Amino acid sequence: MAMFLDTEAKVSKLKKGRRKLWPLPGAPREKQTNVFKFPTDGNDSDEDTNTNSGSSSDGEDGLLTSSGSDSVFNSTDYFSTPEDSQNCTPSDVSDLSDSENLDFKPADVLHDSENSTSPKFITSLVSSDSENSGADSSEEEIEEFIKSKAKQSLQLDAKTEEITSEEDCCVQEDSYDSDGDDVEAFIRQRAEMAITKHKTKRTISTSDDEGPRKSRKKRASKRISSSDDSEDETPKTKMTGTPPLAGNSCYVWPWLN
């Protein structure tokens, strides 16, 4: 009805209090966002709470008038950092290395011929024993100690070589004996099988062989004769050159048989 009246209709205009992002017509305006607060520990001091409250209020004010950017949290006070991991100190490493050295057994190393004959192995033994004995040991004692260790290592090498050679000889003899026994048993089995086959062939008589052969020949001849008779009895159909068009019912079509 307002179109027929001279008075202008009153239109309620929306109040736009939010600030535009750009000074352009139709530009988007700032939006309000909801803020989530992470729970904090109750044992914090009053100073921390005051600083947190101040920063949170400032953050809320800024977030309420944010420009829609990806930065939601302006402060890192709400995040709880994990506890620092316990780092391994050099003292712990030294303790572990000492415990490993105590568990080391040099008896296993002496059995290896290569390590025992090498000069590096002898010098390592001498250095370890000299450190334990102290700095007051004389040069003569060290030389005697080196000679004794070298003799012991050589004796151990000779003993280990003798033991290994004896074991190898025993193993080879056992293997040869077992192989020989297996071969002899195999030969005997083959000979017995050949003898039994030859005996069974001799026991079969020629008359027994001729009987089934004759019966087989008779059966085969009967089958051949019966097949010939059946072929003679059945009349063979003769095909004409061209089939009649009509009036001849005696014509035998090939697909009917």
Swiss-Prot record:
It comes from the Viruses. Residues 72-94, 115-126 have a biased composition (Polar residues). Residues 1-178, 194-248 are annotated as: Disordered. Residues 50-71, 127-136 have a biased composition (Low complexity). Residues 163-178 have a biased composition (Acidic residues). Residues 102-114 have a biased composition (Basic and acidic residues). Residues 12-21 have a biased composition (Basic residues). Belongs to the herpesviridae BKRF4 family. This is Uncharacterized gene 45 protein.
